[in-house]
């Protein structure tokens, strides 16, 4: 039986790529990749698809943004000498960071208003 080595290399590359994606899914995830995948499939139109690597990428972005906001809110609560993060701390953290302020334009319930001094 003749075996083409290029085909075997392609298959082994695809298997190793799948294993890498799988390892990323397993290691320390804050959000469940399967749940994000299901929600993306429900929201994407019928003519397009959602790949496994797309879901892992989206999940990592969500984890990064969540971690960033929570770290800033934690710093705000520590500055105010409070142990619990409230919506007000989230509001102050997001509005205090220029990039997050442009990214998150929505209203945070219970966040009150940021004072604007002329």
UniProtKB/Swiss-Prot annotation:
Domain of life: Eukaryota
InterPro entries named among the record's database cross-references: Histone-fold, Histone_H2A, Histone_H2A/H2B/H3
SMART domains with a match to the protein in the record: H2A
Keyword Cell cycle attached: no
Keywords from the named record: Chromosome, DNA-binding, Nucleosome core, Nucleus
Gene Ontology molecular functions: DNA binding; protein heterodimerization activity; structural constituent of chromatin
Subunit structure: The nucleosome is a histone octamer containing two molecules each of H2A, H2B, H3 and H4 assembled in one H3-H4 heterotetramer and two H2A-H2B heterodimers. The octamer wraps approximately 147 bp of DNA.
Protein name: Histone H2A.8
């Amino acid at each position: 039986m003749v075996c083409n080595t290029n085909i075997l290399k392609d298959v082994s590359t695809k298997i190793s790529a799948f294993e890498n994606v799988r390892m990323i899914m397993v290691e320390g995830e804050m959000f469940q990749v399967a749940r994000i995948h299901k929600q993306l499939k429900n929201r994407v139109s019928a003519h397009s698809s959602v790949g496994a690597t797309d879901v892992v990428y989206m999940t990592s972005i969500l984890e990064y943004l969540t971690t960033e906001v929570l770290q800033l809110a934690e710093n705000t609560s520590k500055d105010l000498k409070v142990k619990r993060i409230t919506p007000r701390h989230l509001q102050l953290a997001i509005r205090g960071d220029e990039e997050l302020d442009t990214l998150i334009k929505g209203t945070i319930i219970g966040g009150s208003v940021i004072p604007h001094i002329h």
